[in-house]
Amino acid sequence: MKGLKGLLVLALGFTGLQVFGQQNPDIKIEKLKDNLYVYTTYNTFKGTKYAANAVYMVTDKGVVVIDSPWGEDKFKSFTDEIYKKHGKKVIMNIATHSHDDRAGGLEYFGKLGAKTYSTKMTDSILAKENKPRAKYTFDNNKSFKVGKTEFQVYYPGKGHTADNVVVWFPKDKVLVGGCIVKSGDSKDLGFIGEAYVNDWTQSIHNIQQKFPDVQYVVAGHDDWKDQTSIQHTLDLISEYQQKQKASN
């Protein structure tokens, strides 16, 4: 927890990030650490344009993509951009929960020949909704090694959804929070139609306890560079619960 509380000062380090020029204005790629990149895609929800963030890792075997661009119209542009920059193909895709901004690319990546993964819980939800599913599934927690690169998928508990997981890159000390972590500029909890707000706080604490030495947190939407996102998420949950209590 101590490491997470000190993340604010690290925001200054983002001024040196390398931003790549993309042909598609709805895709932005920024280098975060060594071979780890944050990609941001944009889409419209209920008339408002939002940014969705995720990451990809360039390994000696190929590229590992966490989640997917938000919208089918961006899939090919995204993979073309990766090949143009790195000369490598996507070999693995992992969805951090069942929503389209995370699992929407499973079918596309699978057709490219990439190994696609999700938790069994996410797979069950996708099956019920008759949506494309990952080829491989696993229980809530799993460690991966691709070439020389190691990373871990961790299920902290319910929050934004029942099935949300985070991804930890230990060498770079980067936590991909997905949608269970709200950005520092979020005004509220966002879409909570499938949320478990009463469980969310404990799930965030589980993340803090599991990964006490995080240096960078990539929130699922909007400004991922604001490293107050973990604490801000807790604050937003508390505010929501207080409002609910006052209205009852």
Swiss-Prot record:
InterPro entries in UniProt: Beta-lactamase_class-B_CS, Metallo-B-lactamas, NDM-1-like, RibonucZ/Hydroxyglut_hydro
PROSITE patterns for this protein: BETA_LACTAMASE_B_1 (PS00743), BETA_LACTAMASE_B_2 (PS00744)
UniProt-listed Enzyme Commission number(s): 3.5.2.6
GO MF annotations in UniProt: beta-lactamase activity; zinc ion binding
Keyword Zinc: yes
Catalytic class of the enzyme: hydrolase
Domain of life of the source: Bacteria
Co-factor binding comment: Binds 2 Zn(2+) ions per subunit.
Broad class of the protein's primary localization: periplasm
UniProt-annotated location(s): Periplasm
Keyword Transport listed: no
Sites where the protein binds Zn(2+) 1: 97, 99, 160
Signal peptide span: 1-21
Function: Confers resistance to the different beta-lactams antibiotics (penicillin, cephalosporin and carbapenem) via the hydrolysis of the beta-lactam ring.
Subunit structure: Monomer.
Protein name, entry field: Metallo-beta-lactamase type 2
Organism encoding this protein: Elizabethkingia meningoseptica
Lineage of source species: Bacteria, Pseudomonadati, Bacteroidota, Flavobacteriia, Flavobacteriales
